[in-house]
UniProtKB/Swiss-Prot annotation:
The EC number(s) this enzyme carries: 3.4.22.-
Function summary: Protease that acts as a positive regulator of the cGAS-STING pathway by catalyzing desumoylation of CGAS. Desumoylation of CGAS promotes DNA-binding activity of CGAS, subsequent oligomerization and activation. Deconjugates SUMO2 and SUMO3 from targeted proteins, but not SUMO1. Catalyzes the deconjugation of poly-SUMO2 and poly-SUMO3 chains. Has very low efficiency in processing full-length SUMO proteins to their mature forms.
Principal subcellular localization: cytoplasm
Similarity comment: family membership: Belongs to the peptidase C48 family.
Provenance organism: Homo sapiens (Human)
Biased composition (Polar residues): 259-271, 310-320
Full protein name: Sentrin-specific protease 7
Active-site residues (renumbered): 860, 939, 992
Example of a GO cellular component annotation carried by this entry: cytoplasm
């Protein structure tokens, strides 16, 4: 075509793109006719330079523009590969290049083309020449466009792939609004050698024009689908940064290209047939040539990488470096092409450094490539670095990778707008935001490559593609969770660049925080450890592993670290609790094990703990602020975790003031700084006087003031078994707690009461052992045995029985302190007997049938009954008439059979144990009563060594026989056998004394008269009798106490 020079027309321009092949005369004449018929249109003025033959247009494109139709048109008439004629234009410093894309989609040919072709990429080749009749006189050589892109794998975001080319919004017109309803376009391709000029650009010819893109007309509607909602002005700061750029806004709804001042270069265009484009657009195979590149809207640092022919997926340039390089390029009048994207009022700012491309893996590339055909992406894959320099191609795989990534990071528009705007504004004050996208990370060159799933790719999204993205939204979110590395690499940079990054906040909230341990801080004023009192130097920190207490003693600052595995108990005493202490601050209490004191001493670097006294085990912290319920619950949770780790289950339960005070109440003020500084002044406890402290704690001491005494007790009465019991306890409105009597010991009763001799005194302390779970002491045992034989046993049985004191057997078997005996010739049995010989000076035990000996061994009570000690062998007698019913009842228990009450005695028979069982089973055989000398062992637990006990008793009887009867008699296993009949057993570890008393009581009620073997006593008494025995004994003592009080008062 001929070179013409036309004046600049502000509102009309047209670019005619022709293939680099010979055109027929009819085609040329048609173009000349069109140009001559419309003098206001743009005329091509500069010849196009030759393009490389290896790069071809994939379809013939004819870019036309009319005054009213400012849309893209594609010429389908030329089906052959035609190489167009070069056209050049002269440079003019006063004019800018303007490229207007004429739409022919609304013609029959355009509609047909739109219906026939799928949404694939338009492919441009180096041979394509784009010319404009409105180009100024500047000669632009080698307007390079991007390589041909395979249709299936390309992104939909066409306008997002060329940031250096700015398209003016055409949605303001009716035709533009109709584009939204049409299917979205796929990504266009530009070749490195395609160059484009617009009258909006200045006429300076410096560098090569780049980033031109062919738009597929049946998909170009999406270019402005979002554009109607965005600003139509070019970033003001961008114009300041590019000193030679002349940015101008078209007032009409046409599409404009903003191109930096460049040196005169050839503007070539070429095309191929439309059928070839259609065939390639339907191709499903993924093929990439090294000369192709996909244009992605990225930052200037990425453009510089692309210019240097380095893959974008392998590194990310530094932000500072990028900005510096950008300024340098602008000062050198480097040619830069900006594609204004008319979507969502976003315009590219050349200074934006936060736009990052990422490095996708091969596996991700395969997975994401299926979405590429639905994405429209703008890329500034090429950019000139200095004057006269030409852009170079980049690996097409890099672009394809970038395209695939955008689908993963794509969110809905509301999320994108909300997240992107504050980030962009944080970097560019006063600048308008670019196209909205979700910035996953912000990184720099020095940080190295980042994962593709968090790349910050600015993109367009069609309605149809939006549906696909929404379906994969959950996949994108899960992908973010799998990339903790991204967050780590970018959190530092984003914090430096962005004052607020909601994306990082969202990602950090998604990341699990299971590594964080429970931690609680308290502000405290003082700490008390043994003799030390320290002032606070911070907060006490409590975790599962340690407790850190920073404090100061004199001029020494100490940070005590207590290992929680050595904690025994803890307590939190609020000021409102335990009003007896009158505390104004809460106290945090820790009790550590004694073996940890050495470690505490080492940390304190103090010789105060050299003695390792008991007071050093307690750590008291006086808190400054009241403890909230939330802090209290969190403290219990921490202690529960510690108790699980250390195995101290009691640690999970806090000690109350009443429970913890006995631990340190005996400490003097010299031993414990807490007693000296705190308790003495706050609680008014007399220092060093444990009894007075205890009296103050229990409110037992008399009031020190002159106020009227407020009643702190109440009377309780109880009726049981026809008897009344009276007790005193605290008021119901007071805090109920266990109270141990700490006053003077008071004698309640003497039994038997005077004037009977040998009375036994029972005090209030003895009543405590009658509580459930307590062992009965010897006083209660002796008292009740005396009570039984005096009150419960019959006179006949009393004459035949004798009960030793519970101290008898202990005295008999005790070890002698004096090793030298008066008579060394005495045997061991004689020595033992000598210890208790006075116990029977007024009684002859050999005149008794039953001798009861309470035995206590290893805190276990059981009963030994010496039966018929005066007999040398078993004797069978007739049942006495008076005891026939009792004996028959006993036999029914022994044999588990019933015997008639009117059973008559028969002649005396000497039967063995086996014969006795057979005669018992036969009702017609007459029965005899057996009196057998033996030692019965009635044990409810069978935990004692009964053989030693039996042997000791045999030896005692042998010596006692010699003393009393002055003859020798041997008590052996044959003539004094030991028997252990089956008796009711205890079901706990504390009722052995109760069972002993019940054995004696049952014996007196139902004595054993027939000692024929075997003796069965399993059903001697019901179990419920044992359950009430303690309370019965208590009531008995209180009843006797009241009786004796009345008797003494009268």
């Amino acid at each position: 075509m001929d070179k013409r020079k036309l004046g600049r027309r502000p509102s009309s321009s047209e670019i005619i793109t022709e293939g680099k092949r010979k055109k027929s005369s009819s085609d040329l004449s048609e173009i000349r006719k069109m140009l001559n018929a419309k003098p206001e249109d743009v005329h091509v003025q500069s010849p196009l330079s030759k393009f490389r033959s290896s790069e071809r247009w994939t379809l013939p494109l004819q870019w036309e523009r009319s005054l009213r139709n400012k849309v893209i048109s594609l010429d389908h008439k030329n089906k052959k590969h035609i190489r167009g004629c070069p056209v050049t234009s002269k440079s003019s410093p006063e004019r800018q290049l303007k490229v207007m894309l004429t739409n022919v989609l609304w013609t029959d040919l355009g509609r047909k083309f739109r219906k026939t072709l799928p949404r694939n990429d338009a492919n441009l080749c180096d041979a394509n020449k784009v010319q404009s009749d409105s180009l100024p006189s500047t000669s632009v050589d080698s307007l390079e466009t991007c390589q041909k892109l395979e249709p299936l794998r390309q992104s939909l975001n066409l306008s997002e792939r060329i940031p250096r080319v700015i398209l003016t919004n055409v949605l303001g017109t009716e035709l533009g609004r109709k584009y939204i309803r049409t299917p979205p376009v796929t990504e266009g391709s530009l070749s490195d050698t395609d160059n484009l000029q617009s009258e909006q650009l200045s006429s300076s010819s410096d560098g090569s024009l780049e980033s031109y893109q062919n738009l597929n007309p049946h998909k170009s509607c999406y270019l402005s689908e979002r554009g109607s909602q965005r600003s139509k002005t070019v970033d003001d700061n961008s114009a300041k940064q590019t000193a030679h750029n002349k940015e101008k806004r078209r007032k009409d709804d046409g599409i404009s290209l903003l191109i930096s001042d460049t040196q005169p270069e050839d503007l070539n265009s070429g095309s191929r047939g439309c059928d070839h484009l259609e065939q390639e657009s339907r191709n499903k195979d993924v093929k990439y040539s090294d000369s192709k590149v996909e244009l992605t809207l990225i930052s200037r640092k990425t453009k510089r990488r692309l210019r240097n022919n380095l893959p974008d997926s392998q590194y990310c340039t530094s932000l500072d470096k990028s900005t510096e390089q950008t300024k340098k390029q602008e000062d050198d009048s480097t040619i830069s092409t900006e594609f204004e994207k008319p979507s969502e009022n976003y315009h590219q700012d050349p200074k934006l450094p936060e736009e990052i491309t990422t490095k996708p893996t091969k596996s991700d590339f395969t997975k994401l490539s299926s979405l590429n055909s639905q994405e429209l992406t703008l890329s500034n894959a090429t950019k000139s670095a200095s004057a006269g320099s030409t852009t170079e191609t980049v690996e097409n795989s890099n672009s394809i990778d970038i395209v695939g990534i955008s689908s993963l990071v794509e969110k809905d528009e509301n999320e994108l707008n909300t997240i992107e705007k504050p980030i962009l504004r944080g970097h560019n004050e006063g600048n308008q935001s670019l196209i909205s996208a979700e910035p996953i990370v912000v990184s720099s060159d020095e940080e190295g490559p980042v994962e593709h799933k968090s790349s910050e790719i600015l993109k367009l999204q069609s309605k149809q593609d939006r549906e696909t993205t929404n379906e994969n939204e959950s996949t994108s979110e899960s992908a973010l969770l799998e990339l903790p590395l991204i967050t780590c690499e970018s959190v530092q940079m984003s914090s430096e660049l962005c004052p607020y990054n909601p994306v990082m906040e969202n990602i950090s909230s998604i990341m699990p925080s299971n590594e964080m341990d429970l931690q609680l801080d308290f502000i405290f004023t003082s700490v008390y450890i043994g003799k030390i009192k320290g002032a606070s130097k911070g907060c006490v920190t409590i975790t599962k592993k340690y407790i850190k207490i920073p404090f100061q003693v004199s001029l020494n600052e100490i940070s005590l670290l207590v290992d929680t595995t050595h904690l025994k108990r803890f307590g939190l005493w609020k000021s409102k609790d335990d009003n007896h202490s009158k505390r104004s601050h809460a106290i945090l209490f820790f009790w550590v094990s004694s073996d940890y004191l050495q470690e505490i001493q080492t940390q304190l670097e103090h010789s105060v703990l050299s003695q390792q006294s008991k007071s050093s085990e307690f750590i008291f912290l006086e808190l400054h602020n009241p403890v909230s319920q939330r802090e209290e619950l969190k403290l219990k949770d921490i202690m529960t975790e510690i108790s699980i780790i250390s195995g101290e289950l009691e640690l999970s339960y806090p000690l109350s003031w009443v429970q913890a005070f006995p631990l340190f109440q005996n400490l003097s003020s010299k031993e414990s700084s807490f007693i000296h500084y705190y308790c003495v002044s706050t609680c008014s406890f007399p220092a060093g006087v444990a009894v007075a402290e205890e009296m103050k704690l229990k409110s037992v001491s008399q009031p020190s003031n002159t106020d009227a005494a407020k009643p702190t007790y109440t009377f309780l009465q109880k009726q049981s078994s026809g008897c009344y019991s009276l007790s005193i306890t605290s008021n119901p409105d007071e805090e109920w707690r266990e109270v141990r009597h700490t006053g003077l010991v008071q004698k309640l009763i003497v039994y038997p009461p005077p004037p009977t001799k040998g009375g036994l005194g029972v005090t209030n302390e003895d009543l405590e052992c009658l509580e459930e779970g307590e062992f009965l002491n010897d006083v209660i045992i002796d008292f009740y045995l005396k009570y039984l034989i005096l009150e419960k046993a019959s006179d006949e049985l009393v004459e035949r029985s004798h009960i030793f004191s519970s101290f008898f057997y202990k005295c008999l078997t005790r070890k002698e302190n004096n090793l030298t005996e008066d008579n060394p010739n005495l045997s061991m049995a004689q020595r033992r007997h000598k210890r208790v010989r006075t116990w029977t000076r007024h009684i002859n035990i050999f005149n008794k049938d039953y001798i009861f000996v309470p035995v206590n061994e290893s805190s276990h009570w059981y009963l030994a009954v010496i039966c018929f000690p005066w007999l040398e062998e078993a004797v069978y007698e007739d049942f006495p008439q008076t005891v026939s019913q009792q004996s028959q009842a006993q036999q029914s228990q022994n044999d588990n059979k019933t015997i008639d009450n009117d059973l008559r005695t028969t002649s005396t028979l000497s039967l063995s144990a086996e014969d006795s069982q057979s005669t018992e089973s036969n009702m017609s055989v007459p029965k005899k009563m057996c009196k057998r000398p033996c030692i019965l062992i009635l044990d409810s637990l069978k935990a004692a060594s009964v053989q030693n006990t039996v042997q000791n008793l045999r030896e005692y009887l042998e010596v006692e026989w010699e003393v009393k009867l002055k003859t020798h008699r041997q008590f052996s296993k044959t003539n004094m056998v030991d028997l252990c009949p089956k008796v009711p057993k205890q079901d706990n570890s504390s009722d052995c004394g109760v069972y002993l008393l019940q054995y004696v009581e049952s014996f007196f009620k139902d004595p054993i008269v027939n000692f024929e073997l075997p003796i069965h006593l399993e059903k001697w008494f019901p179990r419920h009798v044992i359950k009430t025995k303690r309370e019965d004994i208590r009531e008995l003592i209180l009843k006797l106490h009241l009786q004796q009080q009345k008797g003494s008062s009268s």
